[in-house]
């Protein structure tokens, strides 16, 4: 339900801490058990430790029971769909169900289309299973 995911992202955006950029971001995702998790960006004077909205959303995922993300979106202050940075694409891949969909500036895409040829947990599991 993209409308419910967008609504959660809009609500999360309201909690963004952005005193430096003034660019709030909200993120939300549907989890494989039906929950919706969300997050907002949290800036820091030491820019390198700023948390993207996807990072706090994954924290919400883990704090509320874990699981795998099946559908995801992030938005700006105007509720326009925006793309995650490279680090966050990798973070999303780590916590995604196979084939996770996401709303992008080019329409609905899978995680594999947004981060092609990614390396993640499934690769490590494949190596471990060959060693057994």
In which residue ranges do the predicted regions lie?
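C-terminal binding/interaction regions
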Residues: 1-15, 64-132
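Short beta-strand scaffold segments in enzyme catalytic cores
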Residues: 22-31
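Compact, glycine-rich, soluble single-domain proteins
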Residues: 41-55
């Amino acid at each position: 339900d993209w409308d419910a995911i967008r609504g959660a992202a809009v609500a999360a955006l309201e909690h963004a801490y952005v005193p430096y950029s003034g660019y709030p971001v909200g993120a939300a995702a549907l989890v494989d058990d039906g929950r919706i998790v969300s997050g907002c960006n949290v800036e820091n004077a030491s820019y390198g430790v700023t948390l993207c909205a996807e990072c706090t959303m994954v924290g919400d995922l883990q704090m509320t029971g874990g699981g795998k993300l099946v559908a995801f979106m992030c938005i700006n202050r105007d509720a326009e769909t925006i793309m995650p940075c490279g680090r966050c694409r990798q973070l999303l891949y780590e916590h995604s169900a196979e084939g996770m969909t996401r709303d992008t500036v080019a329409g609905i895409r899978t995680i594999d289309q947004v981060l092609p040829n990614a390396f993640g947990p499934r690769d490590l599991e494949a190596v471990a299973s060959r060693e057994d």
